[in-house]
Swiss-Prot record:
Binding site residues for substrate: 257, 314-316
Catalytic activity: succinate + ATP + CoA = succinyl-CoA + ADP + phosphate; GTP + succinate + CoA = succinyl-CoA + GDP + phosphate
Official protein name in the record: Succinate--CoA ligase [ADP-forming] subunit beta
Residue ranges of domain ATP-grasp in the record: 9-237
EC number: 6.2.1.5
Primary gene name: sucC
GO CC term, one of those recorded: succinate-CoA ligase complex
Amino acid sequence: MKLHEYQARDILARYGVPVTGGGVATTPAEARAIAEQIGGRVVVKAQVFVGGRGKAGGVKLADTPEQAEQVAGQILGMNIKGLTVEKVLVAEAITYEREIYLGAIMDRASRRIVMMASAEGGVEIEEVARTNPEAIVKVAAHPMLGLLDFQARDLAYGIGLTDAKQARQFAQIATALYRAYMDVDASLAEINPLVVRADGSLQALDSKIVLDDSGLFRHPDLEAMRDASDEPEAEQRAREAGITYIKLDGDIGCMVNGAGLAMATMDVIKLYGGEPANFLDIGGGASKEKVKTALQIILSDPNVKAVMFNIFGGITRVDEVAKGIVAALSEVQTNVPMIARLVGTNEEEGRRILAESALIPAATLAEAAEKAVHAARAG
């Protein structure tokens, strides 16, 4: 679950990260009131879950409260990469001499939380990793002891913060970011940029936190921050139904039970020259209603030219899945060809149910993938 910038900065501020003054506004009048409280120059920033806000006109400076009101009126309601701006962050605009990147992320290879810093702040860290990987300094936090003081200082020295006072403040901010990351069950937390002001002090200008959905049951206060308006309708519907769904760029819809089997299914589709349109795991013990909802979600993607079912019935009963597919097809009028490979518990009954439909049967995963790719190309 993604948090907006204003939500992330509020969390980091509670941990002692120095942030600029400001607040969130939903109307131009609210933006003016916040600018009046700040006094002086402000920056008005669109709050949407996409990058490139500045290039799209979603970040503007204002010298007066009147200007802030005018600028907010221009940004609110703006469409940025398909998302409508409903909130803006009005924050103090400051001058600075240098931009730094600081982030925390899970490194699955080492199974540690890795803290990263770079002297090349203000740009996407992925771009820095591609063009100048030597500019990124990393330390792995101890799983029991956490981020140690000397590691935080090593990050500071590694990006050229050699002044003792400056390095000490950076270490404090890095430790605060790490603590926030751990406490809120984040999968990503970053400050970009963390700027160096003329007096040598550090201040966070932009921040980002992505929460691990699996940990949200521990944080009802954070769950309440979810902004469904910026979540694609299909993903929102899938989440509410307990279905794991991620839209991709291909044209072959996939419905599978089990994350590992779903990834293997996508691999085999690509092996036969196709492109998956989605990752969809209906989970174990899927009911008829859940299967019906999953199929409706898949077919809501206009790019889908074929649908492939790959169900291995252990906990999940194949006949229940078959009933769900037939029920969905009775409600959704579609000419999209569908290929089904269903094996396991009650598979004979499941195949009997599907035999009365227009689905194309397949005995193996390879056969199903090959037929799905052929059907998508023919469509």
